Amino acid sequence: MMVFGIQSNWKHHAYGMVFLLLALIRPVPGLAEDINVLMSTEDFLAHAFDGQYQSNIVWITPSFRRQLEQAMNSSFRGARVRYWRNGNRSAWVLERIGKERPITAGFVVENNQILLSRLLTYRESRGGEIQYPGFIAQFKGASLDKVNRLNRHIDGITGATLSVDAIKRMATASLLMAKESATPQQVSTQ
């Protein structure tokens, strides 16, 4: 078929239009939220405590920030962190970026050891094995050694190295903050 002196293959143009339309309507990775909420903060706290707990704040002073960052081998943002306490038991809900998206995990610390750990929300598109209870259960009983590192080896997950590192950093931070929150704070009245 000749159109304006140019030979046109209508089938070629039709296929091109179909591919263009499919490209425009397909979901774009990263725009849709891949959020897997495994446990709410409220459910985690109910599991951590038998109903009674108080909300508290640990202040991140410059010297404590340096200690956190050195132990985590990573920066730490924020001036304060909310936590929950009943007696010697404290619960920490922390969030760190894995490879691309935030991961939310909860840690219960008692007597300078992790008593309970739970992955609360996982937003990454890869490394889904991190959501299995067997991975996060490795942190139970973990404490800090003399240089404020986890005292045990945590098995990684192929393809989820950054997510595993994020959870290890959160576990370390929860132990350090639990120790800091148990220390009486000097309050300046000036």
Which residues does each predicted region cover?
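N-terminal secretory signal peptides that target proteins for export/translocation
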Residues: 1-11
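Sec-dependent N-terminal signal peptides
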Residues: 11-20
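Carboxylate-rich, polar loop motifs that coordinate divalent cations or form catalytic acidic clusters
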Residues: 24
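Flexible, solvent-exposed loop/hinge segments and secondary-structure transition points
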Residues: 31-155, 161, 165, 169-190
